[in-house]
Amino acid sequence: SRGFRVLNWNSYKGSNKIWQEDLERLSSLSDLVVLQEGYLTDNLQDLLNKKQYNWDIAKAFAYNDIYAGVLTASRIKPDFLCSFRAPEPLSGIPKTVLITRYPLSGTDEYLVIANIHMINFSLDPSDYRAQLKKTAEVISQHRGPLIITGDFNSWNTERMKILADIIQELGAQEVVFDTDHRATFMGQQVDHIFYRKLVPLEALTEKVRTSDHNPMLVTFRLADDA
């Protein structure tokens, strides 16, 4: 198959005109648009509707009647979705997870996408582990092709170890980028894309000025044994 392209971006509640131009350009090449800190302005809704995306948002909070959270948009409609929140111990503003499932045309397979924004300001690793484990419990019902993507706030080795263990349990592996401009915090990369029963054909990152995170663009095809 020709494959499909996934854009993942923590867009930092993007709302200005240049940010919108970035998103318009990046999304025009993408079958799936996965945002963290998506800020559901009228402009963003117009852009998604104009491009005929089906989209869902797991709301973290509302500010001035505008919802913010993780948002997943796709060319095809999901046949299942599940979302939940994990409270930030210090700020009180929750982080959200959105899990969607898509029937893959021409096959009897389904693709599951987990769009994750992990909690940040918690020194207790059990909070971090609990949010990932809850996500993994939902995903573990699905045996087929899988993408786990987002801002994992994996800024220390303890968090990276928790993340790596759960990803391994799910039989997934991490995308390696040809050019790697992913955001780092305290020396660790925080944005990741993991996959299972798929083959990455191209994996790029792009430097932008409109967010403190750089977008990740990956083209996948189904693995032969999917």
Which residues does each PLM region occupy?
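Active-site-proximal beta-strand elements of phosphoester/diester hydrolases
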Residues: G3-K13, C82, E109-N120
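N-terminal, active-site-proximal structural segment of metallo-dependent hydrolase catalytic domains
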Residues: S1-K50, A62-Y67, K133, A223-A226
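Loop/turn elements at helix/coil->beta-strand transitions in domains of secreted/extracellular proteins
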Residues: R2-F4, L29-D31, Q52-Y53, D108-L111, ...
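Active-site metal-binding loops of divalent metal-dependent hydrolases
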Residues: S11, G38, I116-M118, G150-F152, ...
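Active-site neighborhood of phospho(di)ester-bond hydrolases with catalytic His/Asp-centered motifs
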Residues: V33-E37, D56-K59, I147-D151, E174-T179
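Structured beta-strand-rich core segments of catalytic domains in phosphoester-bond hydrolases
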Residues: L32, Q36-Y110, E206-K207
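His/acidic metal-ligating clusters that form di-metal
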Residues: I99, P103-S105, Y110-V112, S126-T149, ...
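Metal-dependent phosphoester-hydrolase catalytic domains
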Residues: R101, S140-R143, F152-A226
